Amino acid sequence: MRLVQLSRHSIAFPSPEGALREPNGLLALGGDLSPARLLMAYQRGIFPWFSPGDPILWWSPDPRAVLWPESLHISRSMKRFHKRSPYRVTMNYAFGQVIEGCASDREEGTWITRGVVEAYHRLHELGHAHSIEVWREDELVAGMYGVAQGTLFCGESMFSRMENASKTALLVFCEEFIGHAGKLIDCQVLNDHTASLGACEIPRRDYLNYLNQMRLGRLPNNFWVPRCLFSPQE
């Protein structure tokens, strides 16, 4: 297996089955972050991830981390917190602020460069990338964003600045997603945080099969319309 150099003149990707085993899932480098190429990548189960100053790297790891929304693990303490939550949760109210928050709230550095921010903002304007926002009064305290593929949502990143705020974002989104025929959330690579919330690993081949089925599914036409999903009890 060898790393494939992408052409700037074609948005085609090699098969994910040809990705390297070490580092796990590295498939190709180069190309660009145009909307057409990004959408082609997500349709093939591929995503970009690279450090500032490096070429664009494209990945499709095996196994793949996913979260079945109905399997989201919410602790008893979180359930109690949510019943009296001070947070308001919205969808697609402030995509730019969310991705900027994800880019800046990383002590260890971030792969979300200015070029990445601009690329996903273009996807948002085209109706493919979406955000969930958590507010404490008028302050944005957490958020997450990702790319929709039919009834599958490819989560990209999240940030949190207050207790339980990012968990609130995921909890409310999962409830809304399930309630409107959403099936699966792609978490890309498992980490301690996503594992604690119920994410698990499945073989890449299984993920690609789910993706090929679910990206042809449809959520209600108005699902991604900017709106409030949850308000604190008065």
UniProtKB/Swiss-Prot annotation:
Catalytic activity: N-terminal L-lysyl-[protein] + L-leucyl-tRNA(Leu) = N-terminal L-leucyl-L-lysyl-[protein] + tRNA(Leu) + H(+); N-terminal L-arginyl-[protein] + L-leucyl-tRNA(Leu) = N-terminal L-leucyl-L-arginyl-[protein] + tRNA(Leu) + H(+); L-phenylalanyl-tRNA(Phe) + an N-terminal L-alpha-aminoacyl-[protein] = an N-terminal L-phenylalanyl-L-alpha-aminoacyl-[protein] + tRNA(Phe)
Molecular functions per Gene Ontology: leucyl-tRNA--protein transferase activity
EC number(s) from the headed UniProt entry: 2.3.2.6
Cell compartment(s), UniProt: Cytoplasm
Domain of life of the organism encoding this protein: Bacteria
SUPFAM superfamilies for the chain: Acyl-CoA N-acyltransferases (Nat)
Coiled-coil segments on the chain, per record: none
Protease recorded as keyword: no
Keyword Cytoplasm tagged: yes
Keywords: Acyltransferase, Cytoplasm, Transferase
A GO cellular-component term linked to this record: cytoplasm
GO biological process: protein catabolic process
Family membership: Belongs to the L/F-transferase family.
Function summary: Functions in the N-end rule pathway of protein degradation where it conjugates Leu, Phe and, less efficiently, Met from aminoacyl-tRNAs to the N-termini of proteins containing an N-terminal arginine or lysine.
NCBIfam families found in the cross-reference section: aat
Protein's name according to its UniProt entry: Leucyl/phenylalanyl-tRNA--protein transferase
Biological classification of the source: Bacteria, Pseudomonadati, Pseudomonadota, Gammaproteobacteria, Enterobacterales
